[in-house]
From Swiss-Prot:
The record marks T104 as: Interaction with substrate tRNA. ATP binds at G13, P14, T15, A16, V17, G18, K19, T20. Pfam families: IPPT (PF01715). This is tRNA dimethylallyltransferase. Catalyzes the transfer of a dimethylallyl group onto the adenine at position 37 in tRNAs that read codons beginning with uridine, leading to the formation of N6-(dimethylallyl)adenosine (i(6)A). Belongs to the IPP transferase family. The keyword Nucleotide-binding applies. Monomer. Residues 38-41 are annotated as: Interaction with substrate tRNA. Keywords: ATP-binding, Magnesium, Nucleotide-binding, Transferase, tRNA processing. Substrate binds at T15, A16, V17, G18, K19, T20. One of its GO terms (molecular function) is tRNA dimethylallyltransferase activity. It comes from Staphylococcus saprophyticus subsp. saprophyticus (strain ATCC 15305 / DSM 20229 / NCIMB 8711 / NCTC 7292 / S-41).
Amino acid sequence: MENDKPFIVVLVGPTAVGKTEFSIELAKKYNGEIISGDSMQVYKNMDIGTAKITLDEMSGIPHQMIDILEPDEPFSAYEFKNRAQKLIKEITHRGRVPIIVGGTGLYIQSLIYDYAFEDETISEAHSESVETQLAELDQLSNDELHQYLASFDEISAQDIHPNNRKRVRRAIQYYLKTKKLLSSRKKVQQFTENYDTLLLGIEMSRDILYQRINTRVDIMLERGLLSEVKQLVENGYETSQSMQAIGYKEIVPVINGQISLDEATNKLKQHSRNYAKRQMTWFKNKLDVLWLDREKMSLSLMLDEVSVQIQKRRT
């Protein structure tokens, strides 16, 4: 292993592929602590819809970046990177191996590589002007604000749902600040690794994965997803950005009497399958992953392959 960079293990893969189970085995074998790389598991009281690991499933392995925010608090790749970097230092200092587990690709990418966004620094006067314009736009409805965005950045408008007011506003703010379109913005990324990273991924055939996703949704509903979402709505979180996540946005209309549970269930399964497909495409296009086939390999064989890869780094 490289001596000048901390060693970390990163485990990626689509939703429902079995990352949680394998991560526990990895942590047991390599004296690891797990950092969640999931954009939703940071939120308290959003357990069932995020398939959050339970205390029993943790098997005594320390887990970080879970239940750290209220549902109405913002969270971003930038915030994740800052917190994860500190945790990696702490875990390494304890003589343990940081194991980052997640399906949010941008979070993983931002942590592994030097990754930053274009500078948006502007003068104080310009900043005040932008804020004044935004304050006026804040009077618009979601649909009106979305239409305003579409008037100059149609691509971003197509990519962002009208109800995702935060992202719509952000795209407008970026344009007002820079006179550039958010859709044409290029992220500045230097492919310099911040860590000595063993990047693993779990995969399986699409048919089997989709079956697992459908089953997982059924289990979520049996475990009380409807009650969880109802409680969040009653607590005033219905319009929070976190409630736009898959697993929640499909159930809110049921709570409000707009659609049936059967219709919501079908939507949730479809959205989850679509998300899994996007995840796999992203991981395979953006990251250099050592893929482990869960259908062809037992957990034991997967662990053996990890041992081989670690041994190679030591020689």
